[in-house]
């Protein structure tokens, strides 16, 4: 029991430090991981260095790294800005222009990191705002919250989706259709439809005509082909049978990550040869979110450390006792607790921590006989992903959008964000909450 409290204390201190010293989150997570390893070597925990290395989900890290590299090439090709402009010239007024731009950001975000999506689409939103002489603040906020929503739609849309997919043994297609039922993708899309109505109401007074033209020229179509190829190969990888040979099994477990990294390397090498320069490789390396990769590496070890110490089981018991073996009450608690918590804390460490807790709770349900955990997994992902839209600091995409606005001399007040974030989040969460329970909970 004392070792469990020690592990819990280290974990809570780690979390508090990551919240207060966000710039140093990777260092804090790695330091905490090292503490668990040292305590394991000292015999305090049954936790060896090999256990720590085995706890790291290398498939997730490879997927994140490869996807980020592809996104850099995709942005450089100017294809996202070109597509956005093509959409804008076909709408009747500013209300629809902003809404369509937000929806477009959502579609892109289903396959591209949320922050990268904001960086892609924000310049188009700024240009439209300048032409029409309207404030870009609500436009970029709408883009940010929409990209956060759709990040949960597919396995490659966001880090939290990658974490869920890998932890639950889901493949790319399982997000669309799994075990004879519609997957979480359709719940996210229902949430998108509900939030579309919210956006149209919010921007109902923006009735000015749009006088825009397609000015962007695509410089390279190969990155777009690589993005499409990534999705296609992930689908193919979903159908590959699991091998029995241990070596092949290890490669099989990394298949999604290897697809993303492999196509990224093809794009980099091809661009370096085409330009007779290594600049593309250096730019991709510079744009790689090394902080997130190091943060996750450390967190995987920390979470395994607290699992070995019994903290995960104790947390599962606590949730189970609160819900009283009522699956619907537990599902509701997970969804809305995740919404509230993710409004103030980063959803990546939250989801990474809660996945094993949710699995443990599901095993205790039904009088100890256990229940399939998927309804609780999907509730966790929905609440954690959308909860970030409640506040300006709840998601990295929001912070990125606000940073762009400030660089352009705009002031973003809390009420400006809440005016869009709250109705958007509530409408999307409720739609997804009802859908997931009707499809997976009954």
Language-model segments: what does each one mean?
Residues 1-76, 82, 180-317, 412, ...:
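Hydrophobic transmembrane alpha-helices of multi-pass small-molecule transporters
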Residues 16-23, 104-113, 144-156, 336-350, ...:
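Transmembrane alpha-helix interface/packing and boundary motifs in multi-pass membrane proteins
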Residues 29-32, 36, 68, 98-105, ...:
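Alpha-helical transmembrane segments of multi-pass membrane proteins, especially transporters
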Residues 128-224, 368, 372, 399-434:
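Membrane-core helix-loop-helix motifs of multi-pass transport proteins
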Residues 50-137, 292-367:
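Membrane-embedded alpha-helical segments and adjacent helix-loop junctions characteristic
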Residues 177-187, 298, 329-442:
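C-terminal transmembrane helix pair
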Residues 26, 59, 95-96, 137, ...:
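Residues that define the loop-to-transmembrane-helix transition and helix capping
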Residues 83, 116-127, 140-141, 154-170, ...:
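Re-entrant/interfacial helical elements at transmembrane boundaries that shape
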């Amino acid at each position: 029991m004392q070792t469990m409290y020690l592990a819990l204390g280290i974990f809570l201190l780690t979390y508090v430090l990551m919240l207060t010293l966000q710039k140093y989150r990777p260092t804090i997570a790695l330091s905490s991981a090292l503490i668990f390893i040292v305590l394991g070597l000292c015999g305090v925990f049954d936790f060896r260095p090999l256990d720590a290395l085995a706890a790291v989900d290398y498939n997730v890290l490879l997927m994140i790294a490869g996807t980020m590299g592809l996104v850099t090439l995709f942005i450089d090709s100017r294809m996202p800005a070109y597509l956005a402009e093509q959409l804008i010239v076909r709408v009747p007024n500013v209300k629809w222009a902003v809404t369509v731009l937000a929806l477009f950001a959502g579609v892109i975000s289903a396959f591209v990191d949320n922050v990268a999506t904001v960086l892609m689409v924000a310049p188009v939103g700024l240009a439209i705002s300048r032409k029409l002489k309207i404030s870009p603040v609500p436009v970029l906020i709408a883009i940010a919250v929409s990209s956060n929503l759709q990040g949960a739609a597919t396995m490659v849309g966001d880090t939290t989706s990658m974490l869920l997919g890998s932890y639950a043994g889901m493949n790319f297609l399982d997000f669309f259709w799994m075990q004879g039922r519609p997957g979480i993708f359709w719940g996210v899309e229902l949430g998108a439809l509900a939030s579309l109505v919210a956006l149209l109401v919010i921007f109902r007074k923006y009735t000015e005509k749009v006088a825009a033209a397609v000015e962007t020229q695509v410089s390279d179509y190969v990155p777009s082909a690589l993005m499409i190829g990534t999705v296609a190969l992930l689908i193919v990888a979903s159908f590959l049978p699991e091998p029995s040979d241990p070596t092949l099994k290890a490669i099989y477990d990394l298949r999604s990550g290897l697809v993303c990294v492999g196509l990224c390397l093809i794009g980099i090498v091809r661009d370096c040869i085409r330009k007779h320069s290594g600049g593309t490789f250096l730019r991709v390396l510079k744009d790689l979110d090394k902080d997130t990769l190091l943060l996750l590496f450390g967190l995987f070890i920390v979470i395994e450390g607290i699992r070995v110490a019994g903290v995960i089981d104790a947390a599962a018991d606590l949730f189970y006792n609160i819900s009283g073996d009522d699956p619907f009450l537990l599902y509701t608690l997970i969804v809305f607790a995740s919404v509230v918590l993710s409004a103030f804390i980063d959803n990546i460490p939250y989801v990474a921590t809660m996945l094993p807790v949710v699995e443990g709770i599901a095993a205790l349900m039904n009088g100890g006989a256990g229940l399939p955990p998927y309804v609780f997994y999907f509730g966790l992902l929905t609440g954690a992903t959308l909860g970030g839209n409640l506040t300006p600091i709840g998601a990295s995409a929001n912070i990125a959008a606000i940073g762009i606005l400030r660089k352009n001399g705009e002031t973003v007040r809390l009420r400006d964000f809440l005016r869009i974030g709250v109705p958007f989040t509530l409408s999307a969460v409720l739609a997804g909450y009802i859908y997931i329970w009707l499809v997976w909970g009954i």
